[in-house]
């Protein structure tokens, strides 16, 4: 992902304030609620029958944190996202058979959740920088797909 120095500063500056467990659980939960077909990858998570069930599900929250921990790792390697996410791309492609479009959807949901959490601090410039990053991460995660 090519970001200007200003964009990198905006992304990393805001990310330092993100509560990964909270934002990760909310982002994954919203993905599962808004795009219910994504739930098929989470059969082992128990009750996903309603929005409150999904949003309160401890396994959704835990996996959301795990997802954002990986995203944090990616932010430290913006110049090598494909390398950073190679193993995860392989896992999601070969073993889990996740539709790569879901990575794009989750990235967009994450941007919405960040906007909700940070309000006015999430300026159009910050949003534009994050859109570039989530697109780059989604692209890197889809890299191993044939």
Curated annotation (Swiss-Prot):
The modification S-nitrosocysteine is found at residue 93. PANTHER family: HEMOGLOBIN FAMILY MEMBER (PTHR11442), HEMOGLOBIN SUBUNIT BETA (PTHR11442:SF42). This is Hemoglobin subunit beta. The gene is HBB. Keywords: Acetylation, Heme, Iron, Metal-binding, Oxygen transport, Phosphoprotein, S-nitrosylation, Transport. PROSITE patterns: GLOBIN (PS01033). Red blood cells. The modification Phosphothreonine is found at residue 12.
């Amino acid at each position: 992902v090519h970001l200007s120095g200003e964009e990198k500063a905006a992304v990393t500056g805001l990310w330092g304030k993100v509560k990964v467990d909270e934002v990760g659980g909310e982002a994954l939960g919203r993905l599962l609620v808004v795009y219910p077909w994504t739930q098929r990858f989470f059969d082992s998570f128990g009750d996903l029958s309603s929005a409150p069930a999904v949003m309160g599900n401890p396994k959704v929250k835990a996996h959301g944190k795990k997802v954002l921990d990986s995203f944090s790792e990616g932010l430290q390697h913006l110049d090598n996202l494909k390398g950073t996410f190679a193993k995860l791309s392989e896992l999601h492609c070969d073993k889990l058979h996740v539709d790569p479009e879901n990575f794009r959807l989750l990235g967009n949901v994450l941007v919405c959740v960040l906007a909700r959490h940070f309000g006015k601090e999430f300026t159009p410039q910050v949003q534009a920088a994050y859109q570039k990053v989530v697109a780059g991460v989604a692209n890197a995660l889809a890299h191993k797909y044939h």
